[in-house]
């Protein structure tokens, strides 16, 4: 294990976190809020500490798989630990455990909150809270790679560990250039949504914070009723951008390079839009009697379907009051998640497709043991390692889901509350059902349960492996 390499990466993360905190500081200056100075002080401490750590240059810089996974996991933990401090210093979230929960929820783009009154926060803290979504959406190390060379070509192992999905696609030969392209696309989508929201009457502060939550698929609102208080037009704009943010960013690269035909060849994207269309239409018809018109039912249905499948977590209505069938569909969408290579969470549609294709193959092998049948995705054969990795991921995923549900049951809340609390944090969604529904929060859980849910949020965002590897004794042995 090259500890100097990992330390250097953590130092860079701290430097960038210090720079990130300038945004809430400037916001506080605009609104004349003294809380802004807390962010400035912690930002300076992060930057100076990061500079001190990176003073010593790394000899023979190289990131192997082991260093990549450890560096990514520790980077997200360090980012969250320091990111939570301003909430405590300002006194807006006095408990450090609660502040850490809120911060991890932000960076992992989960959007689960312990706050019962979001509107009590200052503009300064609301901006930081939402901006963590944008930083975590595409990945903090991917962001840093787009600016700094870090460790040269070996940074592909960092991107593999941080990027969502069963595999990572290089858009261009160099990792740094791939990171730059991804963030360019990310920034363009962000700017377009901000402009559209402002044009249709949303205040600039609201536009910025809600766009960070939409494009990063986070879901932290700045009002207690989430998105319900905005006009139908604004809700529809957010619906569109939530759905677009759940698309594999390779599709946008095809648009940039004028390869539009390639988009329609991507099986995952076709299935993604098919699920949204089918689920949205069914739910709209199912909840028709709850709203004044069919159009209103469709608006709420497609908003919530888009919000849940992309793991954004915004809400225009209390969907916990919907019929059981509609709620069950939303729970299924929680597990399915968005496309691989997007900012969305969940199990990912690509993995689901691989499993769905593997099942008939396995059944066929039972009858015809000597049959050679190749599983294909987008016309290309899926290699054995990807298939095995998907199966193992599924097993670990449900193991964590069940164990976490068991652990937080010590707080004695009902099964629906506990199961959907774990599902919503592990899949980085935010709201669940019943006690953690869209009009509730996670504040009622004990500190022990909050730590379990924090683990789930980090595990879900980092695709399980980086966080779990930290608990392997063999990892830390010096050879």
How does the language model describe each region?
Residues 1-479:
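Membrane-proximal intracellular helices of multi-pass ion channels
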């Amino acid at each position: 294990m090259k500890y100097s390499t990992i330390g250097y990466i953590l130092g860079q993360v701290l430097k960038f976190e210090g720079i990130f905190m300038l945004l809430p500081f400037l916001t506080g200056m605009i609104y004349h809020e003294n809380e802004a100075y807390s962010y400035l002080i912690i930002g300076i401490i992060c930057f100076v500490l990061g500079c001190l750590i990176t003073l010593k240059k790394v000899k023979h810089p190289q990131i192997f798989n082991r260093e990549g996974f450890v560096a990514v996991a520790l980077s997200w933990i360090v980012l969250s630990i320091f990111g939570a401090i301003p909430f405590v210093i300002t006194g807006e979230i006095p408990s450090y455990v609660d502040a850490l929960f809120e911060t991890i929820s932000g960076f992992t783009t989960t959007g689960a909150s312990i706050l019962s009154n979001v509107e009590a926060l200052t503009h300064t803290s609301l901006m930081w809270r939402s901006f963590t979504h944008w930083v975590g959406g595409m990945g903090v190390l991917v962001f840093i790679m787009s600016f700094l060379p870090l460790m040269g070509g070996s940074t592909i192992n960092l991107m593999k560990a941080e990027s969502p999905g069963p595999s990572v696609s290089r858009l261009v030969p160099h990792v740094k250039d791939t990171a730059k392209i991804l963030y360019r696309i990310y920034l363009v989508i962000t700017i377009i949504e901000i402009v559209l929201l402002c044009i249709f009457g949303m205040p600039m502060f609201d536009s910025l914070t809600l766009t960070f939550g939409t494009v990063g698929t986070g879901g932290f609102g700045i009002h207690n009723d989430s998105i319900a208080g905005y006009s139908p037009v604004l809700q529809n704009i957010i619906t569109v951008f939530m759905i677009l943010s759940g698309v594999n960013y390779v599709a946008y690269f095809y648009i940039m390079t004028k390869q539009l035909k390639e988009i329609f060849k991507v099986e995952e994207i076709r299935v993604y839009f098919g699920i949204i269309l089918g689920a949205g239409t069914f739910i709209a018809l199912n909840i028709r009697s709850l709203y004044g018109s069919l159009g209103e039912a469709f608006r709420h249905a497609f908003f919530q379907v888009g919000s849940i499948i992309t793991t954004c977590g915004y809400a225009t209505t209390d969907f916990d009051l919907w019929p059981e069938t509609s709620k069950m569909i939303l729970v299924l969408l929680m597990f399915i998640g968005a496309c691989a290579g997007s900012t969305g969470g969940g199990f990912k549609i690509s993995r689901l497709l691989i499993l769905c294709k593997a099942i008939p193959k396995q059944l066929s092998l039972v009858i015809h043991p000597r049959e050679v049948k190749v599983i294909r995705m987008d016309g290309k054969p899926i290699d054995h390692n990807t298939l095995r990795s998907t199966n193992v991921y599924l097993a670990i995923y449900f193991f964590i889901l069940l164990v976490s549900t068991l652990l937080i049951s010590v707080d004695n809340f009902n099964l629906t509350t506990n199961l959907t609390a774990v599902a919503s944090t592990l899949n980085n969604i935010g709201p669940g059902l019943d006690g953690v529904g869209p009009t509730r929060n996670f504040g009622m859980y004990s500190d022990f349960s909050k730590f379990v849910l924090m683990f789930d949020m980090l595990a879900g965002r980092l695709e399980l492996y980086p966080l779990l590897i930290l608990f392997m004794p063999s990892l830390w042995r010096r050879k």
